[in-house]
């Protein structure tokens, strides 16, 4: 926008022309206006909202963080909308969260809140929570000390910390697929080379490792129990095989074990249980058993790694919320967490069986699936040729049913992730019948 001439401005504001000249010089110095010789003086475009938006869009292209794929962005945007049926959602429904236990733990925390330190944390986490995690890990065959445990703001936060504080740039990450990690871009941010190891061919992981044997900067990322999204688990023999190969070739293992407490039959050991040389970095979280909003997870690793991560963390966020850590500690200390788990496993198994019964009645001729012995999910793979993207958008736009298509997890199959953890049985039944109707239609 062009501004009036100096003479016009002097007349308009009834001031001396010298005042106008000095004002223009000052505004030019601040960058608000600019002068074109022989043309006049103009207001800078950056004050225009449309221009600002375009500039931000340009600058964001330089960001080291990639945006999620469009389907993931859409899912993230809609999955908090209660008007939709969320048949794939990876969290507990409200009725399954331990509301009474949380209230009691919060009350106990509040009763001695004056004893808490509300200053900046040291990056390692609340000592009492770390100690009680050590105690619980010991009962599961993992013998570590407080110095081997660091509290994080969830499992994904732990992986992000490892990405920037442990793995070098241009590292090679060999991970099982399909996996939720593919929907996060967490390994793509630092130019990591992401190599897929299909979960149903996990025994061939040695061959994949051999292809990169001369690369020093590499790591394995494994979900050993109740993989998200397939619900599959590794056998003890497979876990031992991975450990043996890891030790032989000096390859660290990142073990993502977030569903460790949600099992419907005898629990199997973590990969960390077989670790004798400290090659396994074990990650878990309370997000799947208490609530995502609690934002508390942990890392178990060698003392040197924990020390490094704690130092890096002090450069980022100074640690997780002390209040959330205290609440989780109270639930663990008074055993209410374990009582909650007993009930949770029973209810989730019942909901899983309810979903499987409907699948057997409707989908057995057009799809196949595995029966998971824990976690939240049933992985539905269609036998027929179907456009999963079309199914996703049709259900979303016409039925307000949100499904998570398999391709966001790196799957090449015609697949979707189903969850029995979030919705009521009534909504599960309704959603599955609608999915069946649309699949038969297309």
UniProtKB/Swiss-Prot annotation:
Q: Which CDD domains match?
A: AAT_like, WHTH_GntR
Top-rank lineage group of the source organism: Bacteria
**DNA-binding region per UniProt:** 6-25
Instruction: Give the Gene Ontology MF terms in alphabetical order.
Output: DNA binding; DNA-binding transcription factor activity; pyridoxal phosphate binding; transaminase activity
Keyword vocabulary terms for this entry: Activator, Aminotransferase, DNA-binding, Pyridoxal phosphate, Repressor, Transcription, Transcription regulation, Transferase
Record-linked PANTHER family: AMINOTRANSFERASE, KYNURENINE_ALPHA-AMINOADIPATE AMINOTRANSFERASE, MITOCHONDRIAL
Name by which UniProt lists this protein:
HTH-type transcriptional regulator NorG
**Could you tell me which species this protein originates from?**
Staphylococcus aureus (strain bovine RF122 / ET3-1)
């Amino acid at each position: 926008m062009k501004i009036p001439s100096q003479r016009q401005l002097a007349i308009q504001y009834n001031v001396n022309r010298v005042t106008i000249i000095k004002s223009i010089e000052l505004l030019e110095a601040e960058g608000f206006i600019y002068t074109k010789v022989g043309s006049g003086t103009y207001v800078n475009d950056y004050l225009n909202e449309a221009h600002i938006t375009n500039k931000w869009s340009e600058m964001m292209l330089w960001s080291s963080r990639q945006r999620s794929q469009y389907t993931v962005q859409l899912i993230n945007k809609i999955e908090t909308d209660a008007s939709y049926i969320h048949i794939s959602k990876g969290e507990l429904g409200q009725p399954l969260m331990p509301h009474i236990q949380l209230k009691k733990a919060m009350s106990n925390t509040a009763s001695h809140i004056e004893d808490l330190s509300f200053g900046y944390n040291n990056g390692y986490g609340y000592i009492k929570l770390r100690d009680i995690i050590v105690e619980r890990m010991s009962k599961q065959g993992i013998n570590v000390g407080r110095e081997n445990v660091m509290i994080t703001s969830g499992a994904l936060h732990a992986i992000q910390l490892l990405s920037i504080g442990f793995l070098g740039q241009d590292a090679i990450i060999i991970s099982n697929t399909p996996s939720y990690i593919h929907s996060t871009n967490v390994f793509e941010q630092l130019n990591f080379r992401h190599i897929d190891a299909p979960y149903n061919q996990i025994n061939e992981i040695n061959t994949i490792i051999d292809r990169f044997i001369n690369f020093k900067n590499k790591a394995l990322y494994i979900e050993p129990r109740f993989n998200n999204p397939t619900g599959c688990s590794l056998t003890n023999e497979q876990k031992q095989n991975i450990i043996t190969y890891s030790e032989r070739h000096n390859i660290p293992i990142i073990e993502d074990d977030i569903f460790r407490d949600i099992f419907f039959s005898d629990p199997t050991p973590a990969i960390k249980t077989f670790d004798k040389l400290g090659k396994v970095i074990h990650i878990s979280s309370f997000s799947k058993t208490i609530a995502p909003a609690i934002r508390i997870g942990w890392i178990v690793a060698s003392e040197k790694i924990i020390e490094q991560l704690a130092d890096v963390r002090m450069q980022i966020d100074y640690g997780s919320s002390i209040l959330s850590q205290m609440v989780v500690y109270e639930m663990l200390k008074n055993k209410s967490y374990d009582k909650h788990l007993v009930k949770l496993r029973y209810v989730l198994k019942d909901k899983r069986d309810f979903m499987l019964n409907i699948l057997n009645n409707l989908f057995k001729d057009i799809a196949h699936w595995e029966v998971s012995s824990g976690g939240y999910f049933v992985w539905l793979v269609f036998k027929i040729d179907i456009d999963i993207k079309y199914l996703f958008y049709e259900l979303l736009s016409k039925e307000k049913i949100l499904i998570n298509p398999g391709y966001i997890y790196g799957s090449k199959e015609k697949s979707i992730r189903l969850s029995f953890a979030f919705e009521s049985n009534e909504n599960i039944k309704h959603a599955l019948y609608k999915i069946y109707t649309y699949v038969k239609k297309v």
